[in-house]
Swiss-Prot record:
Compartments where found: Cytoplasm
Native organism: Klebsiella pneumoniae subsp. pneumoniae (strain ATCC 700721 / MGH 78578)
Sites where the protein binds ATP: 622
One GO term describing the cellular component: cytosol
Keywords for this protein: Aminoacyl-tRNA synthetase, ATP-binding, Cytoplasm, Ligase, Nucleotide-binding, Protein biosynthesis
Molecular function per GO: aminoacyl-tRNA deacylase activity; ATP binding; leucine-tRNA ligase activity
Similarity comment text for this entry: Belongs to the class-I aminoacyl-tRNA synthetase family.
Name of the protein described by the UniProt record: Leucine--tRNA ligase
Catalytic activity, as annotated: tRNA(Leu) + L-leucine + ATP = L-leucyl-tRNA(Leu) + AMP + diphosphate
EC class of the enzyme, as a word: ligase
UniProt motif 'HIGH' region: location: 42-52
């Protein structure tokens, strides 16, 4: 065994061993308990970042631990390979998205191997290959035949100069990111999947997810947004159709003083024909990109349409306004306004001088003061005719019943959730498998024409999708008739919604899933990824699982039993102010810092001498140039050190502050472990451990060893507090470093301890553990070794410390057998010289004994 710990030598050797022996490849085995450990698959951006390293290290620690428990562990990896960044990079580098993507995959695969992750590489998949997306296309056509897919027009961001659709992130301050042209809103036909058909189940089944973070479940509940209310129809003077609104507060209906419709509503369009101000307003709204998140903060604007609606209960005429806070995509595109009891309605009414009518009493029973804001709390109705005096629930029901009896109201359950728009007007995605015949008939692509392959050898101009620019690509024949293929591609959330299931049977050619394999491995036992995916990916992931279940492919209701959301990785951020006042961000690697006695940064400069402003710790990002390259760290310290620091520096679900001093500390610890094993093994053969012959000190050390095993097992397996597990191993190592090595039993005990330590470290530092296990002559390879089991008998305390008091004052502490009698404890106390001098010549008048803890002798 070499004396020095040299990770650069051992890590590549161990990785080669894993590759050659296919150590982590698994197949279904009904005789073993399965464990499916999955980290969210990466986008092949070109290089791994520390967020990846943290996510995948957590997964690998769990997978290796479960493997050591004797389970059949599946830990696969793949590539979420479609998406917009590849198009931008292709234009920038004068290439096509495919070669750029495949080059990145090859590079990042080597980086993952360099970090020692125990993946089953035989199951690797890339979502941009026809072998993968063909099954997604086939499934989409089946959903279409079931009535779960439809096409309708929907608003997109349109650049009139480039004649192309822009993603939201390509719209900068209302203008095109490429040519700075003002972006317009344009209605185009798009494909949707009816996720709303599963809204109730997606909501209710959250209650089955006991091991998902409450924050994620709350976010999904709010996103689905189930509400109970009443849909109400209004007659409108001089307008052919009724206006329908939905409200969750029918108790306030007598305070409805106006209606508001979206700018795109047919009523507003009709009114605009004779109203230039309204026509201008509609144009403004059409060209304003409004995310739902912005609605609460933006200025509320509107124009009176001139139409008057009839309040169904009072018969009063109320104005109908077009307003920018109503969206056609939500509900009916019309809302009823109760400015006395809704703050948004109040602000709008105040701005435009509309009637504000209070109909709910304040909590103290007085009329509400509406001089500055609306009263939004529920309460007793007043100013509401026959409904006055009713509380919220009674008022809700009475008004709902009355409207229903009149035929103008209907109780409804509504959802905030909207159907999933899966059309993207981009090139680098899976083609949507639909065709249009010459007579306008839309059909799914026949199965014998699947997959619809995306051509990879293309020229990118940065404006138009190559498959939209090439009229020949779209031409096809269906049932002997000429047809045109759909040139939109799938939203890339499609691919990431079912990849976890395809990992169970990546080579299967008979269909999307091999149900036997899928049902052996699924559901995923633990899924690891960032909380930023809470409502998009994780909702589609759950939805797709239910679709596959209803297609008979899987027999479980949910895709993953446990969800672990890892925290962000933070690093120091520095900048200096340039000549033009701009901020130039400097990498923390290049910052020369001075610290105070508490280790806080007080001064910093870079190599060029710029005085740096320190902005504190913030999320590693390109914009602040504070990312740390994992590859540089691995080359400097070794993969095991980086992994150990990642798991020790913070609980897995909390933010992690990157400190190179902490990495150095992890490296020093591994060197200490290596040194102790080296010193132990160079002393030659080790005798068998004779537990019965151990001295008190040896028993105490063995007790510490097995208590550590018990704690680390609980910390990793149940609590998933990996940092405290490592801390416990470090504490034990400190004791082992001081332990005597004088006789055979000392060395036998050290052998037992080191075999346990190396196995407990294996999930965290697999290369060093693999090597040290062999040096310690462990049985077989550590990858197949069982997790150490705590010996209960070793942890039993056979002695205990008793505090001895004389007249209530502590005079000594004695060690006695756990089962010692009171007489034996008194006798032992009398032999303790510190106690004996206080008893000399005195009579013991009373004895107070708390077994195993305290002996108080009252003397006089």
């Amino acid at each position: 065994m070499q004396e020095q710990y040299r990770p650069e030598e051992i890590e590549s050797k161990v990785q080669l061993h894993w590759d050659e022996n296919r150590t982590f490849e698994v197949t279904e085995d009904e005789s073993k308990e399965k464990y499916y450990c999955l980290s969210m698959l990466p986008y092949p951006s070109g290089r791994l970042h520390m967020g990846h390293v943290r996510n995948y290290t957590i997964g690998d620690v769990i997978a290796r631990y479960q493997r050591m428990l004797g389970k059949n562990v599946l830990q696969p990896i793949g590539w979420d390979a479609f998406g917009l960044p590849a198009e931008g990079a292709a234009v920038k580098n004068n290439t096509a998205p495919a070669p750029w993507t495949y080059d990145n995959i090859a590079y990042m695969k080597n980086q993952l191997k360099m970090l020692g992750f125990g993946y089953d590489w035989s199951r690797e998949l890339a979502t941009c290959t026809p072998e993968y997306y063909r099954w997604e296309q086939k499934f989409f056509t089946e959903l279409y035949k079931k009535g779960l897919v439809y096409k309708k027009t929907s608003a997109v961001n349109w650049c009139p100069n480039d004649q192309t659709v822009l993603a939201n992130e390509q719209v900068i301050d209302g203008c095109c990111w490429r040519c700075d042209t003002k972006v317009e809103r344009k209605e185009i036909p798009q494909w949707f999947i009816k996720i709303t058909a599963y809204a109730d189940e997606l909501l209710n089944d959250l209650d089955k997810l006991d091991h998902w973070p409450d924050t994620v479940k709350t976010m999904q509940r709010n996103w689905i947004g189930r509400s109970e209310g009443v849909e109400i129809s209004f007659d409108v003077n001089d307008y052919a159709d009724k206006l329908t609104v939905y409200t969750t507060r029918p108790d306030t209906f007598m305070g409805c003083t106006y209606l508001a419709v979206a700018a795109g509503h047919p009523l507003a369009q009709q009114a605009a024909a004779n109203n230039p101000a309204l026509a201008t307003f509609i144009d403004e709204c059409r060209n304003t990109k409004v995310a739902e998140a912005d609605m609460a903060t933006m200025e509320k604007k509107g124009v009176d349409t001139g139409f008057k609606a009839i309040h169904p209960l009072t018969g009063e005429e109320i104005p109908v306004w077009a307003a920018n806070f109503v969206l056609m995509e939500y509900g009916t595109g019309a809302v009823m306004a109760v400015p006395g009891h809704d703050q948004r309605d109040y602000e709008f009414a105040s701005k435009y001088g509309l009637n504000i009518k209070p109909v709910i009493l304040a909590a103290d029973g007085s009329e509400p003061d509406l001089s500055e804001q609306a009263l939004t709390e529920k309460g007793v109705l007043f100013n509401s005719g026959e409904f006055s005096g009713l509380d919220y629930e009674a008022g809700f029901n009475a008004i709902a019943d009355k409207l229903a009896a009149m035929g103008v109201g209907e109780r409804k359950v509504n959802y905030r959730l909207r159907d999933w728009g899966v059309s993207r007007q981009r090139y680098w995605g899976a083609p949507i498998p639909m065709v249009t015949l010459e007579d306008g008939t839309v059909l799914p692509t026949p199965e014998d024409q699947l997959p619809v392959i995306l051509p990879e050898d293309v020229v990118m101009d940065g404006i138009t999708s190559p498959i939209k620019a090439d009229p020949e690509w779209a031409k096809t024949t269906v049932n002997g008739q000429p047809a045109l293929r759909e040139t939109d591609t799938f939203d890339t959330f499609m691919e990431s919604s079912w990849y976890y299931a395809r990992y169970t049977c990546p080579q299967y050619q008979e269909g999307m899933l091999d149900s036997k394999a899928a049902n052996y491995w699924l559901p995923v036992d633990i899924y690891i990824g960032g909380i930023e995916h809470a409502i998009m990916h994780l909702l589609y992931f759950r939805f797709f699982h239910k679709l596959m279940r209803d297609a008979g492919m899987v027999n479980s209701d949910e895709p993953a039993k446990q969800l672990l959301c890892q925290g962000m990785v933070l690093a120091d951020a520095f900048y200096y102010v340039g000549e033009n006042g701009e901020r130039n961000w400097v990498s923390p690697v290049d910052a020369i810092v001075e610290r105070d006695e508490k280790g806080r940064i007080v001064k910093a400069k870079d190599a060029a001498g710029h005085e740096l402003v320190y902005t504190g710790m913030s999320k590693m990002s390109k914009s602040k140039n504070n990312g740390i390259d994992p590859q540089v760290m691995v080359e400097r310290y070794g993969a095991d050190t980086v992994r150990l620091f990642m798991m020790f520096a913070s609980p897995a679900d909390m933010t992690l502050e990157w400190q190179e001093s902490g990495v150095e500390g992890a490296n020093r610890f591994l060197k200490r472990v290596w040194k102790l094993v080296y010193e132990h093994t160079t002393k030659g053969e080790v005798a068998a451990l004779n537990v019965a012959a151990l001295s008190e000190d040896q028993k105490a050390l063995r007790r510490d060893i097995h208590k550590t095993i018990a704690k680390v097992t609980d910390d990793i397996g149940r609590r998933q507090t990996f940092n405290t597990a490592i801390a416990a191993i470090m504490e034990l190592m400190n004791k082992l470093a001081k332990a005597p090595q004088e006789d055979e039993q000392d060395r036998a005990l050290m052998q037992e301890a080191l075999l346990a330590v190396v196995r407990m470290l294996n999930p965290f530092t697999p290369h060093a553990s693999f090597t040290l296990w062999r040096e310690l002559n462990g049985e077989g390879d550590i990858d197949n070794a069982p997790w150490p089991v705590a010996d209960e008998s070793a942890m039993v305390e056979d002695s205990t410390l008793v505090v001895v008091q004389v007249n209530g004052k502590v005079r000594g502490k004695i060690t006695v057998a756990v089962d010692a009698t009171e007489e034996q404890v008194r006798e032992r106390a009398g032999q303790e010289h510190l106690v004996a001098k206080y008893l000399d010549g005195k009579t013991v008048r009373k004895v107070i004994y708390v077994p195993g803890k305290l002996l108080n002798l009252v003397v006089g």
